[in-house]
């Protein structure tokens, strides 16, 4: 399971012209599920996201986590983060999970995150979405449950 994590001042997502999720200070996550992912991968990613220290303390050091600052999360399903563009000019998505498995693990991840974080908003799985992000920093971190990076 993989996530592009962006620290934001605010973020929102629109589907079919309607706003379906909005957060203030916190993290926007673009989440992809791999073929071989399990609930353990989702658990790992959930713990990492909730406790990742990428918020600044009073000395401007990254010492505070999402939970420390009472931040919010916008989770966007995005199979393209599983893309492999090392060869050729078109990304290969052969490592991305099939729809049913991806949706099940994505929903599992969101529910686990809701147990830790005060506010979690989501896009719509497999929908075309317009995601607006006001980056804070910018601070962007890549996470992978297989620890590829």
Swiss-Prot record:
Protein name according to UniProt: D-aminoacyl-tRNA deacylase
Any Pfam family matching the protein: Tyr_Deacylase
Family in the record: Belongs to the DTD family.
GO cellular component, one term: cytoplasm
Organism name: Caldicellulosiruptor bescii (strain ATCC BAA-1888 / DSM 6725 / KCTC 15123 / Z-1320)
The EC number(s) this enzyme carries: 3.1.1.96
InterPro entries: Daa-tRNA_deacyls_DTD, DTD-like_sf
Function: An aminoacyl-tRNA editing enzyme that deacylates mischarged D-aminoacyl-tRNAs. Also deacylates mischarged glycyl-tRNA(Ala), protecting cells against glycine mischarging by AlaRS. Acts via tRNA-based rather than protein-based catalysis; rejects L-amino acids rather than detecting D-amino acids in the active site. By recycling D-aminoacyl-tRNA to D-amino acids and free tRNA molecules, this enzyme counteracts the toxicity associated with the formation of D-aminoacyl-tRNA entities in vivo and helps enforce protein L-homochirality.
Domains (record comment): A Gly-cisPro motif from one monomer fits into the active site of the other monomer to allow specific chiral rejection of L-amino acids.
Residue ranges of the motif Gly-cisPro motif, important for rejection of L-amino acids: 137-138
Top-rank taxon, per record: Bacteria
Reaction it catalyzes: glycyl-tRNA(Ala) + H2O = tRNA(Ala) + glycine + H(+); a D-aminoacyl-tRNA + H2O = a tRNA + a D-alpha-amino acid + H(+)
């Amino acid at each position: 399971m993989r996530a592009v994590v962006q620290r934001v001042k605010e973020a929102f997502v629109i589907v079919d012209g309607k706003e379906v999720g909005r957060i203030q200070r916190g993290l926007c996550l673009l989440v992809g599920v791999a073929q071989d992912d399990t609930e353990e991968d989702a658990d790992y990613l959930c713990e990492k996201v909730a406790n990742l220290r990428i918020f600044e303390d009073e000395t401007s050091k990254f010492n505070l986590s999402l939970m420390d600052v009472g931040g919010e999360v916008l989770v966007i399903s995005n199979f393209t983060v599983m893309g492999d563009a090392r060869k050729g000019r078109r990304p290969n998505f052969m490592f991305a999970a099939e729809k049913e498995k991806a949706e099940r693990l994505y929903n599992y991840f969101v529910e686990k995150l809701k147990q830790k974080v005060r506010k979690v908003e989501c896009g719509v799985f497999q929908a075309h979405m317009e995601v607006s992000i006001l980056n804070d920093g910018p601070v962007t971190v890549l996470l992978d449950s297989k620890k590829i990076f």
